[in-house]
Curated annotation (Swiss-Prot):
GO cellular component: cytoplasm
Listed name of the protein: Homogentisate 1,2-dioxygenase
Keyword Iron: yes
Active site: H308 (proton acceptor)
Length: 455
């Protein structure tokens, strides 16, 4: 049974009676990377220290570190958890043979082809979130602590007596179909399509499906923690604003029984028996915690004169690399917006990129592709692979009346852009839902060049 009572936190702070009614939005604390404090039972958090000799209510104090102890203060991430049992209490791990969810990106040749897939089919047998993960591509490694893995998920069952944590990286969840209720050690995230959630490395959780079936995308970030991009001359506001990020208030389960703890460690899945729910954190404080963000709140920036700016203006979150100005991974979106540029080809232009681009579509239609790119589908354009609008989109935009704005509605596309080449997995290359004729979308782009008469 979930015991979720953030009103106790409010009463502790504001003298409000714990039984006072509250709205759903009070189950979250707002801000990005803030120093939060939350307790599901009043008077649990120690005052003025982290690790008292005896924690209130017979709990244990445990620190969860997401960065090195000596990381600069502005980049340091850690939280103190006050829980019923330490995280060390579980059985011995044994290896799980799992063929779909892994970090095996191969060592052979990577085709330079543009790649596209139809939506991952929904399962026909009971499949929970973990069993429904399907690895598409990746680079780097958990060992080196750089790079990413890109996965899809398709599930039709909730995780009941099963819990998961990822020691290899933080997880960026992008639901496309169906709502998720993610129960974590630090509280509960409710996610729906057009929202995203981030689960930090090491945080234990289970996923409940609210609508029976679910599908979406996952970016597993092995590198530097995701943070907001610098705004430069945009100024102090814009893009994803910090106040719109939400971190859950403390909540806990108090269950004992025969449960399974699944860990992802060094690219493999492991399982251990555990005799209690590990979601037993009664209170916590710190800045290393899950969070969610509603993509519909993104403050889109664009040109109001001419030309189409670089897609970096659509960045929601970025994972830094060791090269200044070059990300390990950028998460960008292409949301509803107005296009008003004059003397300009308004859709995204033709492009070859030193970075590699994995795209997905959460909702609607992507404005650079008239057909073939469906919600739940995906595309991969690796380093220097030419890409851009299909022939139908090019013809339409080339003849458009620019005295009228293009009002793009009913869309939400996104991109994981990575510094290193994304190596597609064997299962992705040979998947029955891969569109083998993807290149044909550019076949209609005919030569129209006419040299002017010689003078």
């Amino acid at each position: 049974m979930i015991q979720l009572d953030p009103t106790l936190l409010l009463s502790w702070r504001a003298g409000q009676h714990p039984d006072a009614p509250m709205h759903n939005d009070q189950r979250y604390m707002t801000g990005f990377g803030n120093e939060f404090a939350s307790e599901a039972v009043a008077d649990t958090l120690p005052v003025g220290q982290n690790s008292p000799q005896r924690v209130a209510h017979g709990l244990y104090a445990e620190q969860l570190s997401g960065t090195a102890f000596t990381a600069p203060r502005g980049e340091n991430r850690r939280s103190w958890l006050y829980r019923m049992r330490p995280a060390a209490v579980h059985g011995t791990f044994s290896l799980i043979e799992q063929s779909q969810f892994h970090n095996d990106f191969g060592h052979g040749p990577v085709p330079p082809d543009q790649l596209r897939w139809s939506p991952l089919p929904l399962p026909q047998t009971p499949t929970d979130f973990i069993d429904g993960l399907y690895t598409m591509a990746g680079n780097g490694s958990p060992e080196a602590m750089n790079g990413v893995a890109v996965h899809l998920y398709a599930a039709n069952a909730s995780m009941q007596d099963r819990f998961f944590y990822n020691a290899d990286g933080e997880l960026l969840l992008v639901p496309q179909l169906g709502r998720l209720r993610v129960h974590t050690e630090l509280g509960m995230l409710e996610l729906e399509p057009q929202q995203i959630g981030v689960i930090p490395r090491g945080v234990r959780f289970r996923v409940e499906l609210r609508d029976g079936t679910a599908r979406g995308y996952v970016c597993e970030n092995f590198g530097g923690l995701l943070h907001l991009p610098d705004l430069g001359p945009i100024g102090s506001n814009g893009l994803a604003n910090p106040r719109d990020f939400e971190t859950p208030c403390a909540a806990f389960e108090q269950r004992e029984g025969r449960f399974e703890l699944v860990a992802k460690f060094q690219g493999h899945l492991w399982r251990a028996d555990i005799g209690h729910s590990p979601l037993d954190v009664v209170a916590w404080h710190g800045n290393y915690a899950p969070y969610r963000y509603d993509l519909r709140r993104f403050n889109t920036i664009g040109s109001i004169s001419f030309d189409h700016p670089d897609p970096s203006i659509f960045t929601v979150l970025t994972s830094p690399s060791d090269t200044h100005g070059t990300a390990n991974m950028d998460f960008a979106i292409f949301p509803p917006r107005w296009l008003v540029a004059q003397h300009t080809f308004r859709p995204p232009w033709f492009h070859r990129n030193v970075a590699s681009e994995f795209m997905g579509l959460v909702h609607g239609v992507y404005d650079a592709k008239a057909d073939g790119f469906a919600p739940g589908g995906a595309s991969l354009h690796n380093c220097m692979s030419g890409h851009g609008p299909d022939a139908a989109t090019f013809d339409k935009a080339s003849q458009a009346d620019l005295s009228r704005p293009d009002v793009i509605t009913e869309t939400m596309a996104f991109m994981f852009e990575t510094r290193a080449v994304l190596r597609p997995t064997a299962q992705a290359l040979h998947a029955p839902h891969r569109q083998g004729d993807y290149q044909q979308c550019w076949a209609g782009l005919r030569k129209a060049f006419q040299a002017p008469p010689a003078s």
